[in-house]
Curated annotation (Swiss-Prot):
It comes from the Bacteria. This is 3-ketoacyl-CoA thiolase. Transmembrane segments: none annotated. The gene is fadA. The lineage of its organism: Bacteria, Pseudomonadati, Pseudomonadota, Gammaproteobacteria, Enterobacterales. Catalyzes the final step of fatty acid oxidation in which acetyl-CoA is released and the CoA ester of a fatty acid two carbons shorter is formed. Involved in the aerobic and anaerobic degradation of long-chain fatty acids. Belongs to the thiolase-like superfamily. Thiolase family.
Amino acid sequence: MEQVVIVDAIRTPMGRSKGGAFRNVRAEDLSAHLMRSLLARNPSLTAATLDDIYWGCVQQTLEQGFNIARNAALLAEIPHSVPAVTVNRLCGSSMQALHDAARMIMTGDAQVCLVGGVEHMGHVPMSHGVDFHPGLSRNVAKAAGMMGLTAEMLSRLHGISREMQDQFAARSHARAWAATQSGAFKTEIIPTGGHDADGVLKQFNYDEVIRPETTVEALSTLRPAFDPVSGTVTAGTSSALSDGAAAMLVMSESRARELGLKPRARIRSMAVVGCDPSIMGYGPVPASKLALKKAGLSASDIDVFEMNEAFAAQILPCIKDLGLMEQIDEKINLNGGAIALGHPLGCSGARISTTLINLMERKDAQFGLATMCIGLGQGIATVFERV
């Protein structure tokens, strides 16, 4: 079986969904920009030799509809002979895209794939056109389709206090801002055209969603966003709404050698699981455990974790049940996470994997694990190993 390696991994800055940098930029353009950028950064690879493009996107309608992967590839002037497919596993879409491409390469059905994902939550809101089947309520609690309420449920089941959530959210912003100031994100962010507050076209090379002024004290004044009577989850402890894309160049280790490209990491294992939709945010726990089992590793072997921060109330129970509460500041989301950077749904799997690989290089780490919860009760995880 072929070894699958990541040769390159990049992303756009994360733009605010409400009147942000990408308010006049379409999702296809964000995607095409990264496709072009990956090819430009790796000139020994010709676009015509790509076997396939796998692109995650959740709300596949309006500008994100009709197979956005193919639309973006055409905009990027990738040869017509290269196919492209859009993948949807809700929040895990672009990580699923990575898994799909990896399996094709492992089996020898492909050698080189472009992988990534996008979500423009300013142009195509998360709830746009969603119409749940009324019969679902026979089998699943109605609140299971309301992500904030599932986070409230997790916090109650696991004893996660409002103060713990506020502290974690403040940490996310502080870490993301520190990474921005130190230049840690420069290795992954590709400058991307957008418009400033005055409507002037400019190149953005930083995430505009981070709020460096965030404090625990300020967060403690916010009202519950989903359960106004007895809730603890606020807008400040939820992932920000943002627009963005991320992309990875994935290939067999043998093809990378042929092209003279240095692999940055290899995929050690992959896993996806289902869980109770009412606690959908718990998915990373069984997914991570399964991925670790497949890799022949334990949580203690992992040097760095990237866990998508859908909600502080959601990620803290996962950290707790993976036995990592004492190692948060040494191993988990060292450059902040989605509470600070946002969670553009179809982008996030590739985004956290990109950030993880950069962190692994900076820390000279051997193993890293990226994982995320998925709406309606799923979890997905990938174990990476430095080459």
